Structure formats: structure tokens, C-alpha cells
Amino acid sequence: MANAEYRMLIWGKALLVALFAAALVPGEDKSPSFETQTIRGKVVFLGEVMEQETGIAVVPEARDRVLALQTSRSELIPLIEDVRARAFRRDERLRKMEVELVVRRYANSPAVQIIRVIEVATDGRFEIDYWCDVCSIAMYELKVCECCQGDIALRRTKVPDK
């Protein structure tokens, strides 16, 4: 074997060993850190409430920009607006409900992500979603059915007592 070929073989083996060793070293976990919590209150527009409670002159375009849960202690918890939270923007009936939200609270953020919506009513607790009678599909916001493009209805499913 020629000297150059031997060096290439040695360097190739060294590179393989280095790559294998790097693969074995535990890397930093890139998954976001969050805690699952249950919070209760009414969903409101943050700008409107801040204007009413503090007198801050909120600009008109920001009045209904951010959704928040207002607790019974008047604490305002901003909602990350994904499909679940957008339901509160699209359907004002939801903003009139006392709700219990199962949320993810991410580290280093005051905002939460909604995982589950439960209405707390005088006649019990009800999981809230939308239902298409034609396709038997549940959806999380008011819109046309994703399948048949027909109308969907607000559905309240009784949650068993704990």
C-alpha cells in the first residue's frame, strides 16, 4: 500500500471515530419547556380591558388584537392565538362563557397556549368544540366544515364530575 493511501485510510478511520463519538454525546434538548395548567375565567380582548381598567388610550387597531383570559382576581393572561384561541375571536358566544382552559405555559413567556376549552355553567361543565352532523367531524373554531364545506354547530359535551 502506498504511503498516501495509508494516510487516507488512517484519516478516514479517524473521521469515522470522531463522528461516532459526537453522535454519542448527549446534545442539548431543543424541545420547548412547558407546564400544563388549568386556568379559569372569561376570554376578553386585552386592549379593551386595559383601556377600561387603567384609562390607557389604546389605539383603535389594537383594541381587539390580543386575546387574554381574565381571572376572577382580574389577572390578565395573554393567549397565544392558534386555532383554539382564534375560536374566541370568531365566535363571540365563547367570550360570554365562564371557561376553564387547560393550557401550556411555556418557560419565559407570560402567554399560554390553549389545549382544551371547558365551559363552566350552572348546569355543569361542558367541553366546547364545533361539530359537523354530515361528516361527524369535530373542529376547534367556527368556520365551514373542512370536509363537506357545510355549516357546523357549537357542541357542548358534558364533562363527568371529578
Predicted features and spans:
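Short, charged beta-turn/beta-strand-edge "cap" motif at the junction between a beta-strand
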Residues: 104-110
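Bacterial N-terminal signal peptides
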Residues: 12-23
